[in-house]
Amino acid sequence: MRASVDDPALAHLLCDPETHLAHSPRIFKNEGRCVVALVGGYVMKRWSGYGGLERWKTRWRGTRAARAGWAATALEQAGVATVPVLAWGTREGVIGAPSYLLMAYLADAVDLRSWQGNRLEMAERLGGLIGLLHERGFTHRDLKPSNLLVTPDGCPLLIDLDGLRSVGPVPRSRAIADVVKLGRRMVAPSSLTPSEASRFLSRYCLARGFRGRRNWWTVLREEAGRHDEFRTLRAARKTRA
């Protein structure tokens, strides 16, 4: 195996990852090509069985594990909250071989689907997280509750970074798509209340540097307001006006 670190404890897990996966005490995800399991006090993710396009990407852009590791490192350096990635590796000299990623195990964290708490506060924190993500030049094409962990103190963390892209200045259309997608998939009930949407959008725009109330509302209302998740927010503001 070729690993990204020299730490003996991590290298030991990557020397024979299949054996460790086979004896894992807990499987978080098993979808054939992608397996996520608890291994030696860490979370291991394995990608395997991908076809020609993925092999081409591996040749020119690195394995899925390497790309996820680089993405997590970039997010950490940008100050965007994510689960620490510790190492990654793949079988040397084997075309299409599985690749493996080791991450920290946050035992007390839950994904957003299972989280229970103050929805207004969470909407605000999610707005800040996604706003910072965009402000630092990243987008995530698969924002959804299962790709967000929440720590015991209520801090949301991005996980599953396959959909992460570094694009430099984020186009407004892409930013709106990310915001609306997360709004559509947020904690049940499926749609945001006017207060939750307002908290989300205001904190999002504050993180983007849109300082004035008029500024952030002008930027997002016209496009996000066309979607079901934000229509109630627009109607509520018109009523108050």
Residue ranges: model-predicted function:
Residues 12-110, 128-136, 140, 239-241:
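Conserved ATP-binding subdomain of kinase catalytic cores across diverse folds
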Residues 91, 151-153:
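Short beta-strand micro-motifs enriched in acidic
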Residues 99-104, 155-161:
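A short beta-strand motif that forms the metal-chelation/ATP-contact edge
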Residues 107, 145, 163:
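Short, glycine/acidic-enriched loop or turn micro-motifs at the edges of active sites
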Residues 110-118:
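AlphaC helix of the protein kinase catalytic domain
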Residues 121-129:
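Conserved alphaE helix
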Residues 143-150:
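Hydrophobic residue at the +6 position relative to the catalytic HRD Asp in the kinase catalytic loop
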Residues 157-235:
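C-lobe/activation-segment region of protein kinase-like
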